A protein has these predicted regions:
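Short Cys/His-rich Zn2+-coordinating modules
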Residues: 1-12, 38-44
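A boundary/linker detector
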Residues: 1-9, 88-118
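Short cysteine-rich loop/turn motifs with clustered Cys
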Residues: 6-34, 58
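Short beta-strand-alpha-helix junction that forms the catalytic/metal-binding core
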Residues: 21-22, 44-67
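Short Cys/His-rich "knuckle" micro-motifs
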Residues: 32-38, 66-71
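Short edge-strand/loop segments of extracellular domains
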Residues: 40, 79-80
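Short, surface-exposed acidic
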Residues: 80-90
């Protein structure tokens, strides 16, 4: 439950931060975008809440093209730089305790609120 709530808050922040711009196809997507992880949460749970690893993405790219990684990586390098992309390749921690998850959830609720009030 806590992890799902934290993920929901994080994803909402990512979508608000990036708007309707799909990082993979490099175009505005009318309608709903998703928070697409460059490294999936299954493959790299340590990057689940890493803002450099997650960006707005079309449903087609995120769900039907496995993230469209061939297009995602060059766009990610352009957006955050090669050094930060390479930092994502270093494996880190993969588990959080409940207090940390609640703190993550609360942090992204505040970030989303602040983003929406600008």
């Amino acid at each position: 439950m806590w992890l799902r709530e934290a993920q929901t808050a994080f994803n909402a922040y990512i979508r608000a931060r990036d708007g309707n711009w799909c990082i993979s196809s490099q175009r505005i997507i009318p309608g709903q975008t998703q928070a697409g992880h460059f490294y999936t949460t299954a493959a790299r749970p340590d990057l689940r809440f890493n803002e450099d690893n997650c960006h707005s993405q079309s449903v087609t790219d995120n769900q039907h093209k496995s993230g469209n990684i061939n297009e995602y990586r060059p766009a990610l390098i352009e957006k955050i730089g090669l050094e930060r992309v390479e930092e994502l390749e270093v494996v880190g921690r993969s588990d959080w305790n409940i207090d940390e998850i609640i703190a993550i959830r609360d942090e992204y609720k505040v970030k989303l609120k602040n983003l929406n009030t600008k």
